[in-house]
């Protein structure tokens, strides 16, 4: 069963691009679609994954280390907590590839 989720982060586009560069170009296993939108106070991430386990593996093995690396390079000595994640029941996805 697919997994759809949303979370907001207090980051700008430049920080997002640095995190993406740290993650690399390889498409994460199980990712169906990932959107990033400007939102009040930062960026909103919307993801659709094959499963919650695929999202969690990507978060733990790729996203979290990349965020820590970028924030440490920016001078952070403590890492902020993970943002709250809202989960949704996925009804449909249309993509024009």
Predicted region positions:
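Short S/T/G/P-rich N-terminal loop/turn motif that feeds into the first structured element of a domain
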Residues: 1-46, 50-68, 72-97
């Amino acid at each position: 069963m697919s997994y759809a989720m949303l979370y907001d982060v207090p980051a700008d586009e430049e920080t997002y691009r640095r995190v993406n560069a740290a993650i690399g170009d390889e498409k994460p296993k199980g990712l169906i679609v990932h959107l990033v939108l400007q939102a009040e106070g930062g960026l909103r991430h919307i993801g659709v994954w094959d499963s919650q386990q695929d999202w969690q593996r990507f978060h733990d093995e790729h996203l979290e280390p990349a965020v820590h690396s970028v924030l440490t390079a920016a001078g952070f000595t403590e890492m902020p907590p993970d943002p709250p994640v809202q989960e949704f029941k996925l009804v449909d996805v249309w993509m024009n590839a």
